[in-house]
Amino acid sequence: MGQKVHPNGIRLGIVKPWNATWFASSQEFADNLDGDFKVRQYLTKELKKASLSRIVIERPAKSIRVTIHTARPGVVIGKKGEDVEKLRAGVAKIAGVPAQINIAEVRKPELDAHLVADSIASQLERRVMFRRAMKRAVQNAMRLGAQGIKVQVGGRLGGAEIARSEWYREGRVPLHTLRADIDYATASAHTQYGVIGVKVWIFKGEVLGGMPAANAVEPKADKPKKQRRSRK
């Protein structure tokens, strides 16, 4: 059987940034790593209904800075910033250093693999037909400018006795092209018949020289050659 490498992991440092950017000595590295894991766990639990996309952690000079990427920033902030202040105190307690929380809004949630996978999983838990949920996600992504999308679900689909997997794809999803900006995420739907896994790949275009291929200068086309008249 063919094995597939993780689409995000293989592109780190090429077209994908890291979710944690800090340096530490060998004595502090394990503690920082454990702290990052616990902070992510805490924020994911607290922000279940906030359409959380990703959490970026930085550690400048004995402090921690957390950037929360979400499609619903109002839910994270709360009334007069009460909720975000509560989160800041919780993160500072877990990390053991002063914390700062920034919130970044995801403008197009239909093009974010994490949000699409979570949306499909929540629909499956509400007993929406899996084919309808998949096709709706694919159509929304293509409508908003994705160059390609693939969605796969696996498990006891429709309550079947035997588990199987089905997928639906539209456009291009070039997994072997390292300069391709591919967003990948997974989610789990806990249904009455068991767990259904959801995988989403979204191709947003190629990155050439640090900028999207759509903005790159196209090479000039050669002038058409004049045809010689045949001698009679």
Swiss-Prot record:
Entries under SMART domains matching the protein: KH
SUPFAM superfamilies in the record: Prokaryotic type KH domain (KH-domain type II), Ribosomal protein S3 C-terminal domain
Domain KH type-2: 39-107
InterPro entries: KH_dom, KH_dom-like_a/b, KH_dom_type_2, KH_sf_prok-type, Ribosomal_S3_C_sf, Ribosomal_uS3_bac-typ, Ribosomal_uS3_C, Ribosomal_uS3_CS
One term of GO molecular function: structural constituent of ribosome
Record flagged with keyword Ribonucleoprotein: yes
Keywords assigned: Ribonucleoprotein, Ribosomal protein, RNA-binding, rRNA-binding
A Pfam family per the record: KH_2
GO annotation, biological process: translation
Record flagged with keyword Ribosomal protein: yes
Family in the record: Belongs to the universal ribosomal protein uS3 family.
Protein name, entry field: Small ribosomal subunit protein uS3
Source organism per UniProt: Aliivibrio salmonicida (strain LFI1238)
Species lineage: Bacteria, Pseudomonadati, Pseudomonadota, Gammaproteobacteria, Vibrionales
